[in-house]
Amino acid sequence: MADIANYKDAASNRHLRFKLQSLSRRLDELEEATKNLQKAEDELLDLQDKVIQAEGSNSSMLAEIEVLRQRVLKIEGKDEEIKRAEDLCHTMKEKLEEEENLTRELKSEIDRLQKRMADLEKLEEALSRSKNECSQLCLSLNEERNLTKKISSELEMLRVKVKELESSEDRLEKTEQSLVSELEKLKSLTLSFVNERKYLNEKEKENEKLIKELTQKLEQNKKINRDHMRNASTFLERNDLRIEDGISSTLPSKESRRKGSLDYLKQVENETRDKSENEKNRNQEDNKVKDLNQEIEKLKTQIKHFESLEEELKKMRAKNNDLQDNYLTELNKNRSLASQLEEVKLQVKKQKELGNGDIEGEDAFLLGRGRHERTKLKGHGGEVSVSKHTSREQSPQHKRERLRNRGFALNDEHCSLSNKQVSSPAFTNKRAAKASNMGVGPDSGTQETKRTEDRLAPGSSQSEGKKGREQPSVLSRYPPAAQDHTKVWRGNPKPGTESGLKGKVEKTTRTFSDSAHGSVPNDVVGKGDKTSDFSSEAHCGKRGQVPGHASQVTQVAESGCSKAIGALASSQRASSEGLSKGKKAANGLETDANFPHSKAPILSKYPYSSRSQENILQGFSVPNKEGVDHSVAVVMEDSSQHEALRCRVIKSSGREKPDSDDDLDIESLVTAKLVNTTITPEPEPKLQPNSREKVKSRGGTRTPLFENDKNAAVENDSAKSMRSSSNAVEFPDANCAGVKNQRPFSPREALRSRAIIKPVIIDKDVKKIMGGSGTEVVLEKQKSTPKSVTSKVTSSITIYPSDSSGPRAVPTEAPRERHTSTSNIQVGPPELTSVSNHISSPLELSIHKHDITLQLTEAERVGDGSPKNRAETVVSRSSILIKPSDSVERNSHAFPAETIRWKSHSTSSEVASSDTRHITVRNAWKSKRDLKCSEDPPTRIGRNVEATNAYTQRSSTDFLELEQPRSHPPEQGTRKVGNSGDAPELSSRRTQSSLTASEVLTRRNRIGDAVTAASWNHSSNVVSLTFLPSALICLTEDLGNTEGWEMLNLR
């Protein structure tokens, strides 16, 4: 116990000791602590002091300290949060790492998947394409199925058709056999036609040979009869021998039809051959079907053709029968004509014995009858053939031969008795048609034939009767040149679209042109006409004619000219018999009564013949106040000579009555030994009321064309002409009334139309006229110029054909001479050979010198200002071409430019040929006119002046201009001729036609060089006067200039 107690005590002691130590240590620490505290308290006190001191200034610091304390406290609290956050961050890092590993794995998977997707897309596209293709294939399969069904059905149908075609083939074979038999029949018919055609051609050749022989005989008779035929003109003027062509014109139509049938048969044969070949080549069913269808169609067409051919054959047979009947009647007529020709020959022998007796007139009268009958025959049959021969006849050689043959045939007909029978009127018609075809194109020929056929029915007989009258027997007029004239009488008709009108005109033209020109082709005549037309147109325009009317005027004028031709022929005959007989115009009137039908076509043919023609017509006709027809009968006679120029020209305004072409023809009657063409450049105060009234009654309707100046002028002209001819013969108004107004004509037709005024016999003393005939022609031209000027001078140029002496220069002899020169006044637009539509109608105007002088004196009496004006009115310029028959051959070749030449009368041909001076007028003239002389037969004396239609007016003005500068020196000569006791002015104006050829040539030499195109500006009318008997005078008037005569050789 005590130990435990001790022990305890010891333990307690120890413990106490530790406590004491610890306490002592603690006390030490506390002491240190107290010391530190004390220091700290000191420092705090110091700080407090400082703080207290600084509190005033640093209160904000205290606030900040407090804030900082608070922040420290917060930071301490945040530290804990940061620790927590750190823990969280660690955890997050771990998670992120895990996620990154996952994402990597996912990316690799995505790449794999994308590649697979691309592959899948490609597969899908391929699938879609395949689907579309499948759908299309399905559609196409369906379509093919449908097609196969259709094809199968079609095959079945085709099989059925093939069977049918096989059956039809059998039928077709049978029909082919029948067709072959028919073809053989047709071939036999065509062979017979060909043989007939050969036979007819041979016959024609024989006839042509006979005609040539007859023409030679006639030429021999001409030389013997020239001197004896001068006095026959008075009687012959009554009698126109017109030998009309026969039915031969219808033959060419037959031949053409035969040709067409032959061609058709050939075509049929070719088709049959093709058929057989096709049948052989057929191997497949489809080809067979096609071939069979084609063959069936061909066979049908062939059957139709055969039917049409059969109808044509029937028609042709009927026509052939008619033609044969007509041919027989014409043969009978030809025989009667042959007997008449024998009688005429006997009378010609008597005339030779008697010399210049009156028997010639009787002979001419008989000849005229023969011609009348022939013309009547000719009218119906002749014109039909014209169109058909056109194609053959258009070669220049053929044309020449035709013209020659025609001329020979006409000569033979006049001279030979039985020989005329050889050349039937039908045959001559063929020639005339061919000749006309030469001048005209084939087209115009066909047109003309159509028109002629249409118009022939009403007016052919009348025109023929008139034609007979219009053709004065040329033999009596111009013993030397008579045959030539007769030749041209027939040759002029031109087939063409206008044949109806033109055929009639051609008839009249034939009568005049043939008598005047011998074998002058229509174109030749047309050329002269055209030249006159140009000048006349230019004059008309200058005279103030309305251009619109100009064409109509030309038409009317031309128709009037053609009428005047017939009228002249008839009137000349009548006048040759005497004025008392001249009033016999009843003959002319009778023919004229026929004229309305026959001549109206002429007017229509020459709707625009030319103003010069109109002027001539106007000169002949005064405006009808009655308005019946524009026909004006101007009767011009030399009172002393009893030479009545009765120019009845119907100037119907084409505008008023287009349909009355035929009627117009009636009035174109010129009965006068002389045709006095009066030019009325100045108004003449003096007019005979009687003559005016006469003229007015006939030409009143014509006034609308030239109502202002021309009416007065026409009245003056007619009055003068009436005054000049005391024995003026009035045409019965019945003819005028019978004449219908022409339909208006287009300028184109006017250009186509030509009126040729051909020779008329003048009864004046040959001696008188030999001296001074030139002025008469000039005056005639003036007449032809429009009546715009009242002062008229009518000039008649009579050149006696038989008078061989080249110089008839003595003007003093003029009053005595009964110079029968036919003036070929060609009035009409120029005619080109190429222009098919042109037809020239010859008008024969023979102007009596006394008529010219009378009217000149009247003009002077009237007191027309200065005598020079009268003279100018007579002929300001005239180109006279006196061309001996010998020179006709020269016309065969055309010169590039017109040459103006003077030639002496028939005997003066030698002098003329040597002396003739060629003056090229101007190149434009050439271009304006195609001068066709190549076609002229040597016998042809007429002048051919052709010009293109476009240049008609210009050419006329040019022609006048050429003449104007030359006109002054010849003017004196012309006045001398006119001076036949009437006026000194006329005496001073002796025309150069009366001058010897040498004188004319000298004047030409002086004047010709002065010719310039500028001089052509004067208003003037050109009238080409052709003196056919031995010379051709182209007379051109240029108003406003002194008269001048020039030989104008237009080739």
From Swiss-Prot:
User: Which residue windows are coiled coil?
Assistant: 11-354
Composition-biased stretches, type Low complexity, lie in: 789-799
The compartments listed are: Cytoplasm, Cytoskeleton, Microtubule organizing center, Centrosome; Cytoplasm, Cytoskeleton, Cilium basal body; Midbody; Chromosome, Centromere
Q: Which GO CC annotations does the UniProt entry carry? A: actin cytoskeleton; actin filament; bicellular tight junction; centrosome; CERF complex; chromosome, centromeric region; ciliary basal body; cytoplasm
Predominant place of localization: cytoplasm
Q: Where is this region: Disordered?
A: 247-293, 374-401, 432-554, 569-601, 675-727, 789-837, 929-1000
Q: Keyword annotations for this protein?
A: Acetylation, Actin-binding, Cell junction, Cell projection, Centromere, Chromosome, Coiled coil, Cytoplasm, Cytoskeleton, Microtubule, Nucleus, Phosphoprotein, Tight junction
GO-annotated biological processes: apical constriction; artery development; contractile ring contraction; negative regulation of cilium assembly; neural fold bending; protein localization to actin cytoskeleton; regulation of protein complex stability; stress fiber assembly
* Molecular function terms, GO-annotated: actin filament binding; microtubule binding
Subunit record text: Component of the CERF-1 ISWI chromatin remodeling complex (also called the CECR2-containing remodeling factor (CERF) complex) at least composed of CECR2 and SMARCA1. Component of the CERF-5 ISWI chromatin remodeling complex at least composed of CECR2 and SMARCA5/SNF2H. LUZP1 is detected as part of the CERF-1 and CERF-5 complexes in embryonic stem (ES) cells where it is involved in complex stabilization but is not detected in the complexes in the testis. Interacts (via C-terminus) with LIMA1/EPLIN; both proteins restrict ciliation and may work together to regulate this process.
> What does the UniProt function comment say about this protein?
F-actin cross-linking protein. Stabilizes actin and acts as a negative regulator of primary cilium formation. Positively regulates the phosphorylation of both myosin II and protein phosphatase 1 regulatory subunit PPP1R12A/MYPT1 and promotes the assembly of myosin II stacks within actin stress fibers. Inhibits the phosphorylation of myosin light chain MYL9 by DAPK3 and suppresses the constriction velocity of the contractile ring during cytokinesis.
What is the name of the protein in this document? Leucine zipper protein 1
What is the species listed in this Swiss-Prot or TrEMBL entry?
Answer: Rattus norvegicus
- Per the record, the gene is Luzp1
